[in-house]
C-alpha cells in the first residue's frame, strides 16, 4: 500500500500534462537548482513586501507553510501563513517538475516501477530484496538533487538545499537536510552516491502516513 502511494504521489507530481493536476502541469521548470535564490522568512522585514504566495508558483506546501517563487523576480520565499486562525487541511507535496530534472524524474519513475513490480509479483520476503526501500528512494532523490546542483555551480549548493528544508520538526521532508560534508567554495567536491542501510521509520514513511490520512 505504501509503495502504491509513493508511486501515485511521485507519478502525479512529477510529470507535466497530467489531467488530474492541471495547475501543477503549467508551472515553469527550474533548470538549475543552484541559482542565486534568496530565502526570505516571514519574520524578516523584507518579507513584508510580499504578503502571499502566488498559487501558480508554489514549490512546496505543508499545512500553513509554503515555499513559493513570486513572478516578479527569482527569489524563493518561505512564507508562513501566521495570520490564519485555523490552518487549512492540506497534503504535504512537492512538485518534482520544479526541483528535479528530466533525468531525475526518469530515475524516480524507474525506482517506483521496480518497487511496484516487487510488491506485485514477489513473496513478501523478496519484496524488500527486489524493490527499493523508502529510505533508499529518498537517498537516491537527494543524491540526484545534490548532483545536479554540483554540475551547475557547486559552491552555492548548501544554500540552495537549505531552501527546501523547513527547520521546524513538524514538517515532513522529501530530501535529506544539508550536511557538513556538502561542497564549499574552498573545497573541491568529490561526488558519490552511497545508499546507506535503511532504518525505519524513515521520512518517507511519515510523509506517506500523513498523506494517507487525508
UniProtKB/Swiss-Prot annotation:
The keyword Acyltransferase does not apply. One of its GO terms (cellular component) is virion membrane. Keywords: Glycoprotein, Host-virus interaction, Late protein, Membrane, Signal, Viral attachment to host cell, Viral attachment to host entry receptor, Virion, Virus entry into host cell. The lineage of its organism: Viruses, Duplodnaviria, Heunggongvirae, Peploviricota, Herviviricetes. Interacts with isoform gQ1. The heterodimer gQ1-gQ2 associates with the glycoprotein complex gH-gL to form a tetrameric complex. The gH/gL/gQ1/gQ2 complex binds to human receptor CD46. It comes from the Viruses. It is found in: Virion membrane; Host endoplasmic reticulum-Golgi intermediate compartment. This is Glycoprotein Q2.
Amino acid at each position: 500500500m505504501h509503495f502504491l502511494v509513493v508511486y501515485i504521489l511521485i507519478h502525479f507530481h512529477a510529470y507535466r500534462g497530467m489531467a488530474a493536476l492541471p495547475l501543477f502541469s503549467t508551472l515553469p521548470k527550474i533548470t538549475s537548482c543552484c541559482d542565486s535564490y534568496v530565502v526570505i522568512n516571514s519574520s524578516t522585514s523584507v518579507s513584508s513586501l510580499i504578503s502571499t504566495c502566488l498559487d501558480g508558483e508554489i514549490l512546496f506546501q505543508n499545512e500553513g507553510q509554503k515555499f513559493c517563487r513570486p513572478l516578479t523576480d527569482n527569489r524563493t520565499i518561505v512564507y508562513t501563513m501566521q495570520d490564519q486562525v485555523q490552518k487549512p487541511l492540506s497534503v504535504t507535496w512537492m512538485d518534482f517538475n520544479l526541483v528535479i530534472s528530466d533525468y531525475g524524474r526518469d530515475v524516480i519513475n524507474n525506482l517506483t516501477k521496480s518497487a511496484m513490480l516487487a510488491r506485485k509479483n514477489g513473496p513478501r520476503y523478496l519484496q524488500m530484496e527486489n524493490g527499493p526501500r523508502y529510505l533508499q528512494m529518498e537517498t537516491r532523490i537527494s543524491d540526484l538533487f545534490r548532483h545536479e546542483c554540483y554540475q551547475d555551480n557547486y559552491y552555492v549548493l548548501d544554500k540552495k538545499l537549505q531552501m527546501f528544508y523547513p527547520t521546524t520538526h513538524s514538517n515532513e521532508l522529501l530530501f535529506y537536510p544539508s550536511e557538513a560534508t556538502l561542497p564549499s567554495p574552498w573545497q573541491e567536491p568529490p561526488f558519490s552516491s552511497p545508499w546507506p542501510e535503511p532504518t525505519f521509520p524513515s521520512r518517507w514513511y511519515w510523509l506517506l502516513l500523513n498523506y494517507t490520512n487525508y
